[in-house]
Amino acid sequence: MLSFWEQKELIHYDYIVVGSGITGLSTACVIKERKPNAHILVLERGLLPTGASTKNAGFACIGSLSEKVYDLALMGEDKLLQLIENRWIGLQLLRKRLGDTAIDFQNNGGYELILNHESNSHVEQLSSMNDRLRPIFKQDVFKEDKNKINAFGFNANKIQSMVVNSLEGQINTGKMMNALHQYASSLGIKIITGADVSVIEENDKYVLVHANSSYNNIAFKASKVAICTNAFTRKLFPHLEINPGRGQVLVTSPISDLKVKGIFSFDEGFYYFRNFENRIIFGGGRNLDFEKEATTSFETNEKIIAQLQQYLSEMIIPNYSYTIEQTWTGIMAFGPNKLPLLQSMSDRIAMGVRLNGMGVALGSKIAEDLADIMLSDD
């Protein structure tokens, strides 16, 4: 039961954004930046963002060379280049909005490991890929460098080469989301957590967003609604082609004299690791168990964790003493290709979801485009 005051002051908004991850909060911020007097509400089902925005490894990246070679065959050159440019634009928007200090951005470079048992055929396309990307970046993006294998302390018997991207970096995911939350609040955006949106109803005048909590159920009202729930979107729109993909992540104890510095990936990006100070954060392995990892359930997959630990001990930090301090999971959203799903569902409802594991890079750009849709008739 709502009071008179709640009905009068706390239920009605100009815009409601469902989902308080990178895309959702950024969408609310863009709308507020462009329309300062707008009354905006963000609803989040968890006490913290539910999907991957606070659970990712903190890669400020555009994707590895092998990923791009694969994606070129999957979607063609025009779509690939647009996607890469959008990732780059998104990273610059995120850094500009929050500042590098607030997100602890470090431009330590990105590295793709080419393992001994892998074909290095994509390295043969390095020059041609650089040619394709030069109009966007005004420089060569990739170069091969075998010398860094020993410099980082890797097992050189397991790795035949590395491809370097000096444009990439890393962030502190927790600081970034904290800064984004604080920035949104400073603009006057209202954020309610623990509000599980169950139903969205629309008529010709407004949209009702039904949110449930352990205490009550409330129908919030807005002129327009933005859906930014990524892997959890099919709960509201079951017909959409959005498939969840769970990511397993672990973090080591502090390691003395750790040489690893930067962001790293291998096996077409299915495995990824980085240093955080003198620790290693390592995630991935979804391709070991696609079926089991196609879920929105936050559970550890022991098969994948065991493989991560094996790569750590045998290849990444083979001569170090450490323990695994923590494991966790994040839920991403994937589709038939690498393209995000950005569309109007009606005149009053639009969505920006399915970021294919690239939310840090794409979230701020998708937010700009989603805000364009939300404000198009205003």
Show the residue positions of the predicted features.
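Extreme N-terminal leader/targeting segments of oxidoreductases
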Residues: 1-15, 33-34, 38
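Glycine-rich FAD pyrophosphate-binding loop
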Residues: 32-55
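Glycine-rich active-site loop/strand segments that organize a redox cofactor
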Residues: 51, 55-85
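Active-site lid/adjacent beta-loop-alpha segment flanking the redox-cofactor pocket in flavoenzymes
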Residues: 258-340, 344-346
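Helical element adjacent to the flavin cofactor pocket in flavoenzyme catalytic cores
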Residues: 156-220
